[in-house]
C-alpha cells in the first residue's frame, strides 16, 4: 500500500468511524450532474469540521512532547481555533488563541457569537492582535511569553496546516477511496483551499489512490499566484514525510473569494441557501459557501475535465452562520 508510512506517526483517534460520503439527489437534479458530498462537517467534536483530522496528529505530537498548552492563531471566527480549543479541553490542556479581526467589523454578532462564543465555553485564553501579518513569528513570540509564565506550550500553525497536520487529509483520501471503491467513479473533487493543509493532504493521497480524479481547490483568501506555492510546498513536505513522490498538478480556481477572506459574497451565500433548501445541509459564508459557488459555476462554465460525478469535501464551518447574521 503506497501510504503505509502513515502508521508511523502518533495519532489520537478523535473521529472514530469514517464520516459519511453521501449522494445529493435533489442537488444533483438541480445541477444536472451527479454530486456527492464528504461530510467532514459532522466530525464528532465542537460542532464538527475538517480541522479535527489534523488535530489527531498535532495533539498526539503535543502530548508526546509533554506540552500542557496548545497555542494557535486565526480569525475571530476561526473554525480551526474553535476545534483546537475543544481538543485542548478534552485533553485537559490549556489553550491560548491569538486572534485577528480580518474584516475590520464592529458588528457585535461577529465579535461575540458563533465560533467566538464557543471559545469562551471551552475556557480559551484570548490574545488579540491588529493583524496576523507574520503568524509563525507571532505564534513563536506568544509561546515564549507563555513559557515564561511556567507553561509548556506547543504551537499549532494557522489552520493546523503543516506537514504533520496535513497527514489528516492523506488519511481522509484513504477513507474516500475506500468509500468510493465499487460504488462510484469520482471524476472531480472540489475543496476549499485556504491555509492549504487540507488541499495538500488530499493532493498527495488522491494522487496515489484515485489518480484518475482531478482535485480542484477553490481559493478562499488568495489569488492562484499566491496560493499555488503554499499548496505545492506543503504537498512536497507531506510527500517527504511519507517517503512518496508527489507530482500531481495542483489545480486552483480563484474566481470566487472576492471581495476577500471572511467577507461573504452573493454567489457564496446563494450556494449556502441552495444546499440548505435542497438537502438540509449547512455550508458557511467563508469557506464552503464559496467553494460550492465554484462547483456550481464550474459546471455551468464546463470547467471540469468531463461530466462525471463530482465529490464536494464539506469541511464544516456552520457555526459562523450565526456570527454573520443578519447578512445571511
Swiss-Prot record:
GO terms for molecular function: D-cysteine desulfhydrase activity. Keywords: Lyase, Pyridoxal phosphate. Its EC number is 4.4.1.15. Catalyzes the alpha,beta-elimination reaction of D-cysteine and of several D-cysteine derivatives. It could be a defense mechanism against D-cysteine. Belongs to the ACC deaminase/D-cysteine desulfhydrase family. NCBIfam families: ACC_deam_rel, PRK03910.1-1, PRK03910.1-3, PRK03910.1-5. This is D-cysteine desulfhydrase. It comes from Escherichia coli O45:K1 (strain S88 / ExPEC). The gene is dcyD.
Amino acid at each position: 500500500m503506497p501510504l503505509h508510512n502513515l502508521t508511523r506517526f502518533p495519532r489520537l483517534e478523535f473521529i472514530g468511524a469514517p464520516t459519511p460520503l453521501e449522494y445529493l439527489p435533489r442537488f444533483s437534479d438541480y445541477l444536472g450532474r451527479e454530486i456527492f458530498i464528504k461530510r467532514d462537517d459532522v466530525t464528532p467534536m465542537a460542532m464538527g469540521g475538517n480541522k479535527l483530522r489534523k488535530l489527531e496528529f498535532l495533539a498526539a505530537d503535543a502530548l508526546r512532547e509533554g506540552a500542557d498548552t496548545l497555542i494557535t492563531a486565526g480569525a475571530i471566527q476561526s473554525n480551526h481555533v474553535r476545534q483546537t480549543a475543544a481538543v485542548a479541553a478534552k485533553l485537559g490542556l490549556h489553550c491560548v488563541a491569538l486572534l485577528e479581526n480580518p474584516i475590520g467589523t464592529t458588528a457585535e454578532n461577529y465579535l461575540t457569537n458563533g465560533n467566538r462564543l464557543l471559545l469562551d465555553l471551552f475556557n480559551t485564553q484570548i490574545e488579540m492582535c491588529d493583524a496576523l501579518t507574520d503568524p509563525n513569528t507571532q505564534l513563536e513570540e506568544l509561546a515564549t511569553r507563555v513559557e515564561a509564565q511556567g507553561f509548556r506550550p506547543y504551537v499549532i500553525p494557522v489552520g493546523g496546516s503543516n506537514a504533520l497536520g496535513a497527514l489528516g487529509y492523506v488519511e481522509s483520501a484513504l477513507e474516500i477511496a475506500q468509500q468510493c471503491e465499487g460504488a462510484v467513479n469520482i471524476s472531480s473533487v472540489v475543496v476549499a483551499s485556504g491555509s492549504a493543509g487540507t488541499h495538500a493532504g488530499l493532493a498527495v493521497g488522491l494522487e496515489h489512490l484515485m489518480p484518475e480524479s482531478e482535485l480542484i481547490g477553490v481559493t478562499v483568501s488568495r489569488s492562484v499566484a499566491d496560493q499555488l506555492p503554499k499548496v505545492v510546498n506543503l504537498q512536497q513536505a507531506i510527500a517527504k514525510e511519507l517517503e512518496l513522490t508527489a507530482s500531481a498538478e495542483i489545480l486552483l480556481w480563484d474566481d470566487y473569494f472576492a471581495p476577500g477572506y471572511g467577507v461573504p459574497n452573493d454567489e457564496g451565500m446563494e450556494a449556502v441557501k441552495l444546499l440548505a433548501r435542497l438537502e438540509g445541509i449547512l455550508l458557511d459564508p467563508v469557506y464552503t459557501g464559496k467553494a460550492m459557488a465554484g462547483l456550481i459555476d464550474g459546471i455551468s462554465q464546463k470547467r471540469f475535465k468531463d461530466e462525471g460525478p463530482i465529490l464536494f469535501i464539506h469541511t464544516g464551518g456552520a457555526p459562523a452562520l450565526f456570527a454573520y447574521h443578519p447578512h445571511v
